[in-house]
Amino acid sequence: FRDCPPETLPEGKPHRFGGWSLLTAAVAGVTLATGLMAVYLYALPQDDALLTAVGGVTPLVTFHRGDCTVAPENTLPAFRSAILKGGDRIELDVQMTSDGVVVVTHDSNLKRCTGKNAKVYDLTYAEVAQLDAGRWFSSRFADTRIPTLEQVLQLCRGRIGLNVEIKPSAATPALEAETVRLLREYGFDSSNCVITSQSYETLHKVKALAPEYPTGYILALGVGNYYDLPDADFFSVETTFITSGMVNAVHLRGKTVSAWTIDREKVATHMLELGVDDLITDKPDMVQDLLARNQQVDDSLIDFRD
């Protein structure tokens, strides 16, 4: 996947887990059927991960900065791998260079991933394009570059959804508008793209520019009365602060909850139990395997019903 061109990647999503449908199959008040189902459940392997959230809706699987355990984060190889593995979305981070080019990278200072001790907004795109964003990860990815948002959109269009986190700066006031312009130009809309930020002001700007995009407020703590914020359609919350009460309060308002960053099966299982809508993960293989096992349980229950 390191070098495969976009045209060799599959169109559309190669894999998606179906919805869990036990709840729709339940018939209220039928005592015998309920008892038989309980007996059948008891006979299944007693794996907590297999018995969670039965009757709910399968959450999305979002690859955090692409498939970042097999390729350098926020690079085209990481995004290609996410596409090939059938992710629902890629979470990526956008910033702007000094000459107005939107690039995909997480840290405002480029030292960690490139060795260059400089801020993104202090460099031109030509300067950013010279940096090696892959060697730190593995010599196999030497000479991998920081991609532009346009390059990422060309790769991902029609193949995977996006969660675009805008990282604003006082030095780049045009970042929101240019990001929206590019998303629209490449056909990303409310069906395949959401926009997130830790800055509520940024979400307000996005809603004014493009009200059609779902916007997510990223919360490190997830405390306080934020449920009714008008410019936040969903909330992206660190897993430690997600509770059943919080999820219920958000759902009652017609909004959703994304959980980050899920790297352990125990945590993923707990998020399923709480009814979280989107699992943002650095370990997508683990999360997809967990959901597949849940799906097998649901399919067995459907077979039993029929």
Name every feature range the model reports, one short phrase each:
Residues 1-4:
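Selective recognition of hydrophobic, aromatic-rich stretches within alpha-helical transmembrane segments
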Residues 6-306:
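Phosphate-group recognition and catalysis centered on beta-loop-alpha active-site segments
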